[in-house]
Amino acid sequence: MGHYIANLRDIEFCLFDLLGRESILGKSIYKDLDRETVMGMLDEFKRLAENDLAASFVDGDRDGTKFDKATGSVTLPDSIKKSYKAYMDGEWWRIDAPAALGGQVIPMTVRWALAEMVLGSNPAIHLYATGPSFAHVAYMLGTDRDKHIAKLMVD
């Protein structure tokens, strides 16, 4: 058992009982989502966070990155690379990218719940996986050149 256990019932309470997110699901831009789908996403992500992402927390904390000043290169522990790969291979990066770039349209509150699990299990992975978030900002607020760069960032 790793250091992190996601409290999915607490997240469910906050999303649906406290914030009433169910009222916006099934409508407008969230027409393809319902409570069961959102909870399925959260449950699947819980498994990823508690296992694949949390697995590299200790290595990332104790060993960290190594910077070689002579070459300008940075080396990550292999376990961090493996955790990051699991996150990207599961296509969870899509939750932070705009729909126009292949992102998943979900309520911000659901994105925050997923981010909470990443941050709790391994904050370093959250930082390494912020590229799509930056692409989102560049795509939504940037010039035509910025939008082109944003597309490259998620490819």
Predicted regions and their residues:
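Amphipathic, small/basic residue-rich leader segments at the start of a protein or domain
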Residues: 1-125
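Contiguous, well-ordered alpha-helical segments that form the cores/surfaces of helical PPI scaffolds
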Residues: 112-116, 132-140
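Phosphate/diphosphate-binding loops
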Residues: 135-136, 141-155
